């Protein structure tokens, strides 16, 4: 069993924002399998899919991004998941738009959702998939206005293709492990 956690903010006003690309990733995978989200045993929504004999629990924390660790711990406890079973998906403004970066462990790198998960788990030892949202220069309104901003039409086109590849990367992780997925998907989406 794998726990695939897409990070985002739960309110409708955050829909289609750069910061919610993690939600979009798990939503795209759930849609591809026709799996609906329902309330989990904690502050999260969950959809269940099966791929090549592997069960995947797709999780959307219903806490704000900066408190994602609470939902992750609740989901891990309920589903009896180990850190090696989880993949956390989030935005990364330091990666070019449309670039995927899988890692088996590491720091938060300035991503507050990851930071809270690391604090809550007491460890950086879990896989993550960062999706580049392409900050090219310091935004006038500050970093939070950038990540909480909506995608432009051009950005949305790039993200739609990126989400297709992201779905493949998640399934590869679930079946073949993080090292295999890293070797195949750590590159810009073309």
Curated annotation (Swiss-Prot):
InterPro entries from the UniProt entry: Pept_tRNA_hydro (IPR001328), Pept_tRNA_hydro_CS (IPR018171), Pept_tRNA_hydro_sf (IPR036416)
EC numbers: 3.1.1.29
Stretches that traverse the bilayer: none
Record: residues binding tRNA: 14, 64, 66, 112
Primary residence: cytoplasm
Similarity field: Belongs to the PTH family.
Protein name in the entry: Peptidyl-tRNA hydrolase
Organism: Chlorobium phaeovibrioides (strain DSM 265 / 1930)
Gene name for this UniProt entry: pth
